[in-house]
Amino acid sequence: MQGENFTIWSIFFLEGFSQYPGLEVVLFVFSLVMYLTTLLGNSTLILITILDSRLKTPMYLFLGNLSFMDICYTSASVPTLLVNLLSSQKTIIFSGCAVQMYLSLAMGSTECVLLAVMAYDRYVAICNPLRYSIIMNRCVCARMATVSWVTGCLTALLETSFALQIPLCGNLIDHFTCEILAVLKLACTSSLLMNTIMLVVSILLLPIPMLLVCISYIFILSTILRITSAEGRNKAFSTCGAHLTVVILYYGAALSMYLKPSSSNAQKIDKIISLLYGVLTPMLNPIIYSLRNKEVKDAMKKLLGKITLHQTHEHL
């Protein structure tokens, strides 16, 4: 459909990794394994936080939310990536592109806020253990989780709605998904309003939550160093270390994508970072938490034991 000096595209072509046809099969296998592992790992974490009564605490409520976000985030883009890696026609319709863009932004933005909330939860648990159950009661935790979701979903809606109104002078997206920065590179003219919205949202969801995380961990570290019991110190380091590892991986990748000078030569690097950010990080989250957390490992063993026992009874 023709407009004034621009076209409203009904279909987009995703360039993806078509410049490297020899790597597409390798990337397909890599992405498929990562995606299936993400689904299995995060679904297991959600399941054990629901079924195990010992995990009915704020930390595991937030961890369950994080796992659900990771499933939604990867499911928004990876299935399309897998199909396109094996297809000669790497296309996506406008509505599919819009949904993909929104879900990726919404889940990513929500996770940025939730990681800061989880840092505050660890701060209260370690620095104010006697008042923890009062400060982090069910109502407060539910509100914190809700604020994370609402903030992420509303900022994503704002960015997506404005991005989709910008006239585009092409329909070849130099990416494997409808990533907002890649789509905006097709804009016929630079939009000051869109650039301002992107900058404000990026600052709101990246440096500010990171600052809150850093402040929380400064207090946490000072408290841990004053713990005289070696067992208590190791337990505190274990739970905080898992969260801090996830924070560094997630915010590091996000900052390298959204708060750096734009460059036409950096698109190849952006695609690699985006692949790691969108596929590898969600897969690693449950592994990091389960490997470094005795309660999670015990709950997983208990769940596997029940499944094994059930299968044994069925065979008898």
From Swiss-Prot:
Cellular-component GO terms for this entry: plasma membrane
Disulphide bond pairs: C97-C188
Main location: membrane
Family: Belongs to the G-protein coupled receptor 1 family.
PANTHER family named in the record: OLFACTORY RECEPTOR
Protein function: Odorant receptor.
Protein name: Olfactory receptor 2K2
Provenance organism: Homo sapiens
Lineage, highest ranks first: Eukaryota, Metazoa, Chordata, Craniata, Vertebrata
